Regions:
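Extracellular glycan-recognition surfaces and repeat-rich motifs
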Residues: 26-84
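Predominantly extracellular/luminal cell-surface or secreted proteins
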Residues: 5, 130-134, 160-162, 197-201, ...
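Secretory/extracellular carbohydrate-interaction modules
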Residues: 77-158
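Carbohydrate-binding surfaces in secreted/extracellular proteins
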Residues: 106-108, 179-221
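Short, aromatic/His-centered strand-loop micro-motif at the edge of beta-sheets
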Residues: 161-186
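Ligand-recognition surfaces built from glycine- and aromatic
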Residues: 2-9, 22, 215-261
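Generic beta-strand structural signal
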Residues: 65, 69-72, 147, 162, ...
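Hydrophobic residues embedded in beta-strands of well-ordered beta-sheets
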Residues: 61, 72-78, 152-157, 167, ...
Length: 261
């Protein structure tokens, strides 16, 4: 048991910065996508309907916390179903002060189990990291990390806008080898400008260097100040298959931080 020496007031609660490494969170879906709590579930996105196969429920949970292997180091949160997603929408109330903060950024720490740079089991599978999102209607902005048929040792990254659950590209596409162990993914919205960066300290292979893949990614797009101005949610959506042993195609998440400003 833990005790605090005095009653907790609204001033004691930091509402503009949220961080978790997932290890002590209950990994289940909350009815009604409740605000102020982390919501873990699985759903098939609309743009995956042409996938030849889709892994049905292989386990009883959409997410697991623990150790796997290959490129995923240590312990962390990883997918238990294809289409696994995380949604978080903060509680907004005048006494909390969050309703006046329209800008937002997120930093995600990720280790793909795939260690060659391709990130996912098959072409077309992707990870979306979205901010300024209505997590019910799925309207917002983000970064897509996707494996394509063109590369077996790299992924493509580009900015997206979600409109009622349908994603569309809103930036140039960058082919990169940085989606490997130790990948850091940063997405930011500030005054109508969406930007994203991705990088890693893992060195590229000789072949990756010869092929000229970007070692890191920086993307920017103007999205306007009015559209999605009231949205404050985070969406992380992984459409990759699980692979053998139910983890060899997964991506381990070690931590996420959200800042409102």
């Amino acid at each position: 048991q833990c005790f605090y020496e005095k009653a907790i007031s609204p001033e004691d609660v930091e509402t503009d910065r949220i961080w978790t490494d997932f290890h002590n969170l209950p990994l289940y879906s909350h009815a009604g996508n409740e605000k102020g709590v982390w919501n873990f579930d699985a759903k098939r996105p609309a743009d995956t309907c042409d996938f030849e196969k889709w892994d049905r429920e292989k386990t009883q949970a959409s997410w697991h916390y623990g150790a796997t292997g290959d490129g995923s180091k240590g312990e962390g949160l990883y997918q238990g179903m294809q289409g696994a997603r995380i949604r978080y929408t903060p509680t907004t109330a005048p006494e909390m002060g969050t309703e006046t903060k329209r800008n937002m950024e997120v930093l995600l720490e990720a280790d793909p189990a795939k260690s060659a740079g391709q990130g996912f089991g098959s072409a077309g599978q992707y990870l979306d990291v979205c901010i300024k999102t209505d997590t019910d209607t799925l309207d917002g902005y983000g970064l897509r990390i996707i494996r394509t048929a063109a590369h077996s040792d790299a992924v493509s990254m580009y900015l997206i806008q979600y409109v009622r659950g349908q994603a569309q590209c809103i930036s140039r596409e960058v082919v990169t080898n940085c989606f490997v162990t130790g990948c850091r993914i940063w997405v930011r919205y500030e005054n109508g400008i969406l930007s994203a960066k991705a990088w890693t300290v893992t060195e590229p292979t000789v072949v990756q260097q010869e092929r000229g893949y970007a070692r890191g990614v920086e993307l920017t797009a103007e999205v306007g100040r009015r559209e999605n101005a009231e949205n404050t949610g985070l969406l992380i959506w992984h459409t990759g298959s699980l692979g053998t042993e139910n983890w060899r195609n997964t991506t381990m998440l070690h931590g996420v931080s959200i800042l409102y400003f």
